[in-house]
Amino acid sequence: MTNIRKSHPLMKIVNNAFIDLPAPPNISSWWNFGSLLGVCLILQILTGLFLAMHYTPDTTTAFSSVTHICRDVNYGWIIRYMHANGASMFFICLYMHVGRGLYYGSYTFLETWNIGVILLLTVMATAFMGYVLPWGQMSFWGATVITNLLSAIPYIGTNLVEWIWGGFSVDKATLTRFFAFHFILPFIIMAIAMVHLLFLHETGSNNPTGISSDVDKIPFHPYYTIKDILGALLLILALMLLVLFAPDLLGDPDNYTPANPLNTPPHIKPEWYFLFAYAILRSIPNKLGGVLALAFSILILALIPLLHTSKQRSMMFRPLSQCLFWILMADLLTLTWIGGQPVEHPYITIGQLASIMYFLLILVLMPTAGTVENKLLKW
């Protein structure tokens, strides 16, 4: 008799995806972030669900409902901080996952990569809307500033912004719809993630060398299941250290002040994981130019496969490209730092230089390095 694992219509899907899946024998810990993102998503959905049971999406009660969760609901404080810091862990894993894809040339799996870009944008939208829900000062002003950017779109901009707001300013209607979207999007993300996996399993995983591993595969279980469980335990350890010892480390103190449309905070800034894009936005004096640069800074990922000039897939054996890759990482850290600084000298200039470097590295220097390396290897 055939094993039920391999014959049952539902179980064979799970079997082919997580148990008998042929996997490369040499994938490093950089390949753990995919499963960690799955863990993050499940954690966020569960904690979010319990928060939604006590939260009220109304301008008059939103802030106090979050206070009520932290003070009066059993273990409400830990659920709230796991959800807030879980978002930070989610983005750490996301950026590591994308960085891995860039370094090892995983973007040559076009469908998988493009769906990944869509996932990144959806997660960013979800996180932004979630940040508005506690209805603190930074929630309100963050929502006002970011939605207002759409008014830079010619002709339809103002109408578009008022349509998103549901009025003439960020108000009750905005909060209600943001809560509705913030609730539904994680489930949509889960569905897109399944399509992401489906396309990945059409080709099989890449590996650090960038060379096909079809001649030498090992089963996913037990080798990578145990590796993923270890990764998940380390992720949860890091999250709980953050939640239990420094829950407000990555947050903004301004968000402990209830939203007040009559009082603008001195420095409006998003959560740390959006600071690099915010720095690029601020470094261009023109509003429409800034919005376009902001959009392109993320959408540029979709162009990466077209900018690949090397005859080798991975950067493992390409020292010149490696060097530029790590300069790009340093540049992104610089942008993240600048995004959190006030708009004054010398930060403005540093931000502009870092923004120019970001686009120059991706669009010009890295493709050139690929061509140069081909020439050096007489290819």
UniProtKB/Swiss-Prot annotation:
InterPro entries assigned: Cyt_b/b6_C, Cyt_b/b6_C_sf, Cyt_b/b6_N, Cytb/b6-like_sf, Cytochrome_b, Cytochrome_b_C_euk/bac, Cytochrome_b_N_euk/bac, Di-haem_cyt_TM
GO BP term (any one): mitochondrial electron transport, ubiquinol to cytochrome c
Leader peptide range in chain numbering: none
Binding site for a ubiquinone: H201
Chain positions recorded as heme b b566 binding sites: H97, H196
Binding-site residues for heme b b562, renumbered to this chain: H83, H182
Keyword ATP-binding: no
Subcellular location: Mitochondrion inner membrane
SUPFAM superfamilies associated with the record: a domain/subunit of cytochrome bc1 complex (Ubiquinol-cytochrome c reductase), Transmembrane di-heme cytochromes
One Gene Ontology MF term: ubiquinol-cytochrome-c reductase activity
Assembly with partners or alone: The cytochrome bc1 complex contains 11 subunits: 3 respiratory subunits (MT-CYB, CYC1 and UQCRFS1), 2 core proteins (UQCRC1 and UQCRC2) and 6 low-molecular weight proteins (UQCRH/QCR6, UQCRB/QCR7, UQCRQ/QCR8, UQCR10/QCR9, UQCR11/QCR10 and a cleavage product of UQCRFS1). This cytochrome bc1 complex then forms a dimer.
Note from the entry: Heme 1 (or BL or b562) is low-potential and absorbs at about 562 nm, and heme 2 (or BH or b566) is high-potential and absorbs at about 566 nm.
Function per UniProt: Component of the ubiquinol-cytochrome c reductase complex (complex III or cytochrome b-c1 complex) that is part of the mitochondrial respiratory chain. The b-c1 complex mediates electron transfer from ubiquinol to cytochrome c. Contributes to the generation of a proton gradient across the mitochondrial membrane that is then used for ATP synthesis.
Protein's UniProt name: Cytochrome b
